[in-house]
């Protein structure tokens, strides 16, 4: 349970982690040669040798010490919003809602940039993960997203609520609320 607002000592901790704050990420991931490893930051090298693919990602500004690393045999659908690269990494057989996700990312970036502040990253990436859980979560310029709630959801019925757009907008919003502005570990925080 978060500390009460009157507890000034709790202001030294952010709402995500009590043991660390902002870090300069420099992450190297090695995986099978046929997979695409993804981590927060920007790709600075990509090599394949002896059946292994190794990619190094580095942030150009401090990020929260709160991130995920994923690797899979992804297909990648890219798009752009102004000078921001958009990418959806997905199972090649799960392209059903990729265009919907890209459209939602663009609409979210339009809205949040107009109403809050400029977007702080040069890219936004959505990454599919297996439906062992049904959630999406926002990390610095990287949004892991369950196949069950986004990639294989059937939205051909126009009467069905478009949860893919809502969830994508919510997670893009966390690129501001949690990765640009963050509350202390006190009641009322996000």
Q: Where would I find each of the regions flagged by the language model?
A:
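Catalytic Zn2+-binding segment of zinc metalloproteases
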Residues: 172-187
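Active-site metal-coordination segments of metallo-dependent hydrolases
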Residues: 101-102, 185-190
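Hydrophobic helix-coil surface modules that form long, contiguous segments used
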Residues: 1-169
